[in-house]
A protein has these predicted regions:
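A short glycine-rich, Lys/Arg-flanked "PGG" loop and its adjoining helix->strand segment in the class I
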Residues: 133-145
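Class I SAM-dependent methyltransferase Rossmann-like catalytic core
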Residues: 4-42
Length: 188
């Protein structure tokens, strides 16, 4: 079985087993381009990825960030976490088997300050309201003043919630993903 087939099957099995996995297949490169294609990472010091899954975006982000930037991955699914720890061996990366709500605690322990960008693949539609709010509040309070929170979803169900937490929310859409996806680019 090829790596692509293994990744697809692993993702499908995790989707069937765990409600917290939001899609049957990994996200497409087209969706990644909508999320981070226009971002200048040259001055970024800390970038965070919530719910990287099997790392569909992670390697592209790593290729774009500068040599002194830290990329922090928050992945609660143990199978995906283990795959990330075995496939990513970059000294700029911190991989955590923790909930995104713990971002502030980690930044404090590591004495890292605020974050430039947060990319989120967390399926907000599947998360209880209180947890959703907590994740977004923690994202807002840990972003730099010019930082961005970029979230993709398969519906507009949480658009109002994002507008409550962020002063500016821009919306993009791509059909070139399965399923097609909305990308929210949010500023504090």
């Amino acid at each position: 079985m090829t790596n692509i087939s293994q990744t697809f099957m692993s993702h499908l099995l995790e989707f069937l087993k765990h409600r917290s996995v939001g899609t049957v297949v990994p996200s497409s490169a087209f969706l990644g381009k909508k999320m981070y294609g226009n971002i200048d990472f040259s001055k970024a010091e800390v970038v965070v990825e919530f719910g990287p899954g099997c790392g569909a975006f992670t390697k592209d982000i790593l290729a774009k960030i500068n040599p002194n930037c830290t990329l922090i991955l928050f992945e609660t699914n143990t199978v995906f976490y283990n795959k990330l720890t075995t496939s990513i061996k970059d000294k700029r990366v911190i991989i955590l088997n923790k909930n995104a709500e713990q971002i502030g605690d980690l930044l404090a322990v590591k004495n890292m300050g605020k974050v430039d960008y947060i990319f989120s693949s967390i399926p907000l539609a599947l998360i209880p309201k209180g947890v959703k709010r907590s994740i977004l509040q923690n994202a807002v309070s840990n972003l730099k003043p010019n930082g961005k929170y970029i979230q993709f979803q398969y519906s507009l169900a949480d658009y109002k919630l994002l507008k409550k937490h962020f002063s500016r929310v821009r919306l993009k859409f791509t059909m070139l993903n399965f399923p097609p996806a909305f990308v929210y680019s949010c500023s504090v």
